[in-house]
Swiss-Prot record:
One function term, GO molecular function aspect: signaling receptor binding
GO cellular component terms attached to this protein's record: cell surface; extracellular region
Cysteine pairings via disulfide bonds: C24-C37, C31-C43, C45-C54, C65-C75, C69-C81, C83-C92
Protein name in UniProt: EGF-like domain-containing protein 2
Location in the cell: Secreted
Gene3D superfamilies (alphabetical): Laminin
Record flagged with keyword Signal: yes
Length: 357
């Protein structure tokens, strides 16, 4: 007999989460004009406003405009441009991430909101190849730069390819942004910045955010079999395996872990781990979360408990990790308070007891 819906626990880890450059839960990326930040990092705008951050008043959109808005920007008030999430500037001409393709070097540049307190670095080295903050040329934004010579042989070396037919030279590098210093989360980004030397075109920036480039995530049962559905109260092993970490790093451990589910436009979520330790709420609800390291991998072991009662709904996980130079160590967490025994009724034992000797 197939299990009833109340006993079926579906897993859909990470696959449907949209990875983008705007995530309203990151510092410096608020929803404007009364908009609400949703569980997936997108803004739900109030009536009359639109745009990725609800920053555009629909009543001000102009059919006729005295300026040209680039990169799919929208003209409003007749002479101003509302930009998409990847561009900025008076006419949306400036990308947040770009490079100056100089004769002998590639100067990588990035703009971030003034509230940004994270780090931007080349994937080869989180510490040796950081972009440093400089005086910003655009008010209201921080500006970061790193100038890398074409012939660099150090940790910040560029990837160089030469077209055998045309002789064109191509340089590229992967640039990572993390919004919390020393940590990596679901909505931190990775972009490829490149310079192509033939007609000296503007640098090309491609969003290649795919967290499987850094870590692979697997869900399995206690027998290490990969799973997509599991019985309620069975055990889930959620493992983060390092794949291509920034230079100098080998291990991964879990800092924060959140589980959530969406049903009928309602979101239920629970924070399972905070700063490496099981939360009191998770303990009270019986999730029994264990945070471990297995070699160089980080692993959370938890009990499968649905977030909606009597409903077959997939669950998703959001996470924040820390990379380690070798095998990670999990800090010692305080023990949760013992639960008081009920005294108002006679105990009714379920099943055969276990004798501890």
């Amino acid at each position: 007999m197939p299990p009833s819906l109340s006993h079926l626990f579906l897993l859909s880890t990470f696959a449907s989460l949209a990875l983008c450059s705007f995530y309203c839960k990151n510092p410096g990326y608020p929803c404007l004009n009364g908009g609400t930040c949703l569980y997936n990092g997108e803004c739900n705008c109030t009536s009359g406003f639109r745009g990725f951050n609800c920053g555009l008043d629909s009543s001000t959109i102009s059919a006729a405009c005295t300026v040209e808005c680039h990169n799919k920007g929208i003209c409003f008030n007749g002479d101003k441009c509302y930009c998409t999430k990847d561009y900025m500037g008076p006419t949306c001409q400036q990308a947040y991430d770009f490079a100056d393709c100089n004769k002998s070097s590639m100067k990588i540049k990035a703009y971030r909101p003034t509230e940004f307190n994270g780090e931007i670095f080349l994937m080869q080295s989180m510490f040796g190849c950081k972009l440093t903050e400089v005086t910003s040329t655009i008010p209201g934004y921080k500006q970061y730069e790193l100038d890398v010579p074409h012939d660099s042989t150090g940790p910040c070396k560029l990837k160089k390819t030469i077209d055998a037919t045309t002789g064109d030279v191509h340089f590229e590098v992967n640039v990572s942004t993390i919004h919390h210093a020393g940590q990596f989360g679901m909505y931190d980004g990775l972009k490829t910045v490149s310079c192509h030397y033939s007609s000296r075109d503007q640098a090309i920036v491609k969003d290649v955010t795919n967290h499987e480039l850094l870590v692979s995530v697997t869900t399995s049962d206690g027998n290490t079999q990969n799973i997509q559905e599991i019985q309620t109260n069975d055990v889930i092993h959620l493992t983060f395996n390092p794949v291509n970490l920034p230079g100098g790093y080998k291990g991964v451990k879990i800092l924060d872990l959140e589980m959530y589910s969406v049903q009928w436009n309602e979101v239920n979520s629970i924070l399972l781990l905070k700063d490496q330790c099981m939360t009191q709420k998770a303990d009270e609800l019986g999730y029994s979360v264990s945070n471990e390291v297995d070699g160089y991998s980080g692993r959370a072991i938890l009990k499968a408990i649905p977030l909606f009662e009597n409903v077959q709904a997939s669950v998703y996980f959001n996470y924040r990790l820390r990379f380690c130079r070798n095998r990670c160590k999990i800090k010692s967490c305080p023990s949760q308070s013992p639960k008081p025994m009920p005294m108002g009724e006679i105990f009714k034992h379920q099943g055969q007891g276990i004798r501890i000797v």
